[in-house]
């Protein structure tokens, strides 16, 4: 969330930055008008309250002197009614301001490329060249079915489309990837977290999922405010909602395992084949709470930590720095890691690493006590997949496939899998 005072004092900069994003931000003009109206209402309410208090004292004196108070009492009633009308108008105006503020996305960082929608993403770096196969390759759907490790038909029977049943060595591979990633990141000092898979509406608002992505979330009908968790950052960031963190504990790093649930609204017809885009999927998420001056250094550290998973798995990938118009709602800067998928002959996103600066901490009221400033300041929060499990599984099946249809298990996973080949 952007601070109203900051927006008003830097309105030209805010408009300029927001116009590099996707969306119509003409409502900022309304915000300015409402803010002026709010100030006038506050002044008028305070003026009338002062008059009412003054009259109340006069009435008290008149009563002591047994003087007629009828006229002045009528004036007091009139002021009370006027104040009531103005207070209702104030509440309505303040609510309209809050609604606008809640829907304003974060501002792009100065290092983010400001590109038009027609420009391509910025290719930041690549790791490994895609393997050249000397046989006709298969995609993960065909491989999974032939090896009887991915069961789409029974998943559809159990639930519906965009769900999967992992079987045999497929289930073991999914589980091995989770354990491998959790082990790898915890060895680097991340604290392991397995949170609830159901979150409330305040948690969803705090990280920016609400109100923006309400239609892409699963809300529990028998509850007024519970949602199925859409991503690990929601419960992890809200671990410290309404808290003041110790400066000596920053940066505070978490590695979070969650099962995530998304409606994938607006993706009808996209990636319907296979497990690339599912309603339910597993993910290992990286979270950082940092001091403001350290957050962009920690963004680079988090990027390296996410990359290390693919490096140890020896999977080809590239890193993209997203231009301003592709940034997520809460993000100020984002790197996408895209893994090579031979089955589709393309790089596909497997992780987004983002710095939200104080955008989420303002919404969640997460601060730290700054000894230098002698006061509480908002932390910066960072999040990123480390990695999406299902997409990592796709990459392994397709990049490690053999001519006979078997899959060579990456060396780093063999102790988890207890085999070196899937057949």
From Swiss-Prot:
Q: Which UniProt keywords apply?
A: Aminoacyl-tRNA synthetase, ATP-binding, Cytoplasm, Ligase, Nucleotide-binding, Protein biosynthesis
* Gene3D superfamilies found in the cross-reference section: Bira Bifunctional Protein, Domain 2, Serine-tRNA synthetase, tRNA binding domain
Q: In which pathway does it act?
A: Aminoacyl-tRNA biosynthesis; selenocysteinyl-tRNA(Sec) biosynthesis; L-seryl-tRNA(Sec) from L-serine and tRNA(Sec): step 1/1
Which residues does the annotation say bind ATP? 262-264, 349-352
In short, the EC number is 6.1.1.11
Pfam families found in the cross-reference section: Seryl_tRNA_N (PF02403), tRNA-synt_2b (PF00587)
The record's GO CC annotations read: cytoplasm
Free-text note on domains in this protein's UniProt record: Consists of two distinct domains, a catalytic core and a N-terminal extension that is involved in tRNA binding.
The name on file for this protein is Serine--tRNA ligase
- Which classification does the entry list for the species? Bacteria, Bacillati, Mycoplasmatota, Mollicutes, Acholeplasmatales
The coding gene here is serS
């Amino acid at each position: 969330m952007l601070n109203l005072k900051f927006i008003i004092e830097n309105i030209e900069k805010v408009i300029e930055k927001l116009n590099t994003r996707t969306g119509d931000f003409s409502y900022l003009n309304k915000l300015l008008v409402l803010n002026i109206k709010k100030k006038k209402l506050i002044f008028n309410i305070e003026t009338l309250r002062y008059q009412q208090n003054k009259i109340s004292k006069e009435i008290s004196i008149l009563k002591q002197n047994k003087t007629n108070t009828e006229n002045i009492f009528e004036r007091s009633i009139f002021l009370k009614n006027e104040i009531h009308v103005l207070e209702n108008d104030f509440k309505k105006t303040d609510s309209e301001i809050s609604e606008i503020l809640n829907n304003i996305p974060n501002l792009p960082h100065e290092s983010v490329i400001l590109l038009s929608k027609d420009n391509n993403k910025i290719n930041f770096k690549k790791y490994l060249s895609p393997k050249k196969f000397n046989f006709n390759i298969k995609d993960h759907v065909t491989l999974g079915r032939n090896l009887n490790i991915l069961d789409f038909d029974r998943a559809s029977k159990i639930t519906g489309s965009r769900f999967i049943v992992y079987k045999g060595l497929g289930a073991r591979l999914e589980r091995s990837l989770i354990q491998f990633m959790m082990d790898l990141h915890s060895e680097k000092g991340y604290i392991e977290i397995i949170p609830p898979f159901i979150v409330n509406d305040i948690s969803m608002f705090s990280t920016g999922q609400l109100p923006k992505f309400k239609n892409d979330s699963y809300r529990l009908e028998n509850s007024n405010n519970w949602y199925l968790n859409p991503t690990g950052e929601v419960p992890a960031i809200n671990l410290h909602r309404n808290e003041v963190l110790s400066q000596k504990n920053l940066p505070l790093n978490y590695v979070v395992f969650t099962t995530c649930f998304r409606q994938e609204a607006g993706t009808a017809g996209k990636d319907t084949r296979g497990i690339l885009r599912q309603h339910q999927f597993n993910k290992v998420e990286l979270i950082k709470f940092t001091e403001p001056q350290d957050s962009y250094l920690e963004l680079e550290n988090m990027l390296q930590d996410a990359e290390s998973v693919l490096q140890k798995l020896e999977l080809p990938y590239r890193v993209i720095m997203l231009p301003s118009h592709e940034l997520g709602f809460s993000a100020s800067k984002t790197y996408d890691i895209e893994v090579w998928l031979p089955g589709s002959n393309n790089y596909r996103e497997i992780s987004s690493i983002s710095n939200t600066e104080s955008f989420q901490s303002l919404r969640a009221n997460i601060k730290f006590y700054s000894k230098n400033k002698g006061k509480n300041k908002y932390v910066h929060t960072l999040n990123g997949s480390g990695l999406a499990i299902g997409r990592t599984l796709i990459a392994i099946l397709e990049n490690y496939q053999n001519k006979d249809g078997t899959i060579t298990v990456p060396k780093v996973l063999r102790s988890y899998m207890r085999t070196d080949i899937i057949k």
